[in-house]
Amino acid sequence: MPEHLNARVEACYRQAEHFFQRSFPRPTVSFRLRGQKAGVAHLDENLLRFNPQLYRENREHFLEQTVAHEVAHLIAHQLFGPRIRPHGEEWQLIMRGIYGLPPDRCHTYAVKRRATTRYLYRCHCPEHNEFPFSPQRHTLVAKGRRYYCRRCKATLVFTGEVLRE
């Protein structure tokens, strides 16, 4: 999997070097990115991080657009310094002029939301007496924190029911 992506990073750098007639230090490439972002360029560390899940699901477009997008951030930073806007004129020049790609800020990949877990708590109110707690809040209760109903002022009690969405 990383061979194609690393080859694309190298190709983007060679295009930039040919265009600007200078060399650029190669970044460290990581596949340790999760969530909604397809890629992130860490400018000061000269590091590119990519989302392996989105890469697997959108390989062709990812290699073409996302890799060039992130490399363009590093090239723009190395050429123009830290005071430029992330998707400003300099970055757009690199995307259009060197890579011949649209300077799109965001991807349109379908991102699967991860399953959420909720722990059901109750109070003594006749209506609206169920409170779904996040795993973090449930852990705090297990460590002794108490939560109270705003209506009846009773301590919320775990029902033992776990909801997975």
Swiss-Prot record:
It comes from the Bacteria. Residues 10-158 form the SprT-like domain. One of its GO terms (molecular function) is zinc ion binding. GO terms for cellular component: cytoplasm. It is found in: Cytoplasm. Keywords: Cytoplasm, Metal-binding, Zinc. Its cofactor is Zn(2+). Zn(2+) binds at residues 69, 73. The active site is at 70. GO terms for biological process: response to stress. Binds 1 zinc ion. Its main location: cytoplasm. Belongs to the SprT family. This is Protein SprT.
